[in-house]
Amino acid sequence: MKVLPLITLTIIVCVGCEMGSHLVKEEKGIKINSPESSIKEVEELINDYNNAFIAKEYSKIDDLTEVPFVLVNNDKTVSFSTKKELIAEYKRIRESLVESDYSHSEITSLEIIKLNNFISTAKMAYDRYNKSGGVFHSGEGIYLYRKKNERLFLVGRIESSQKDAL
């Protein structure tokens, strides 16, 4: 029966180690395993992505995304296995906005969830504006991010074609 207290002590120590590993540690200005820095990294990627979409900078979108990439909307689910296919879809989406006199998009709400050290999601609502300053489309989606080789990529979108609650 002396084994039971030893097992209990081992479990407590291991749980304590695991809990302590989620704390922010700063050594020489480097944040290790910080939820705040992970969320900031997602926010930066979202801003870069939004700016690239507005400016039709498809090479930047290519740099911010990774394949396979999945796009889910109300009508279909599409998986892109090559960057060429993915960028062609982004061009199709972006170019179709020209007839609406698209100017820019603004994020109206954002909720970022870090699932683990590699995967994060962002539930985002946005408005698309025309050059006159009017909103011609409101949308909402969940964007999927994965970290690979210490770099974050957009790997998928679940998109509502209207601003319906997700």
Label each PLM-derived region with a short phrase.
Residues 17-59, 63:
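Short, low-complexity N-terminal intrinsically disordered segments enriched in polar/charged residues
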Residues 1-26:
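Bacterial Sec-dependent N-terminal signal peptides
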Residues 49, 61-62, 69, 86, ...:
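Hydrophobic pocket/interface hotspot
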Residues 87-132:
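Surface-exposed, charged secondary-structure patches
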Residues 65, 75-76, 124-128, 158-159:
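A mature extracytoplasmic/lumenal domain signature
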Residues 18-27, 136-166:
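Short beta-strand edge/turn micro-motifs at domain boundaries
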Residues 47-51, 63-78:
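Short, solvent-exposed secondary-structure junction/capping segments
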